Amino acid sequence: MAGDWHNNNQAFGNPDYLTDPQFALFASYTKIAAIYRCPADRSTLDVGGSFIPRVRTYALNSYLNWQLGAMNDNDPAYLNFRKSSDVESRHPSDLFTFIDTSPVSVCFPAFQVQMVSYAFFHRPSVEHNHSGTVAFADGHVESHRWTSPQTWDLAHTVTATGPSPDPNWLHSGGGDGDHIRIISGGGNPDLRWLQQHASVLK
């Protein structure tokens, strides 16, 4: 499906990006845009002075054949699953596919995970009592509880110039005003979980 850099609000208020075959390969199977949006998301977008609901909160694991060139921050040491046979040989029950994304972190349709880092790129949603929906390559879906208070706070932190959720956390720098990349000296159990379920070494 089509998407855009997350500060282009118009791209996230247009259901055609989800249901028009011109923009979305899933369009012939999924006719209803509402399936892409978690009902718990109450956020709105300012599009030309009008506030409208965001049409999508779910994103797809970027290691499932994400191919957007320069926008691809996937670690080349890890497998980019291009074929179903790639998935079948690598424990599909442990590989996440779609994930409920923090409303302030929704961007291109991919959910990127930095594999060898203490930094979040995209952030999971915590709207269901610190939990979010995660689907897996074997077809099962579960409500996954995120355990770190830093993850809970980060899911609602909008700008990289704002205060860190915890005084022990530091902004990683680089002037990234679009994605908050927070580092923690001790790591984050939720980030580790994402890394363990996003891909495997080649």
Model-predicted regions and their roles:
Residues M1-K202:
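Short, well-structured segments within or immediately adjacent to enzyme catalytic domains
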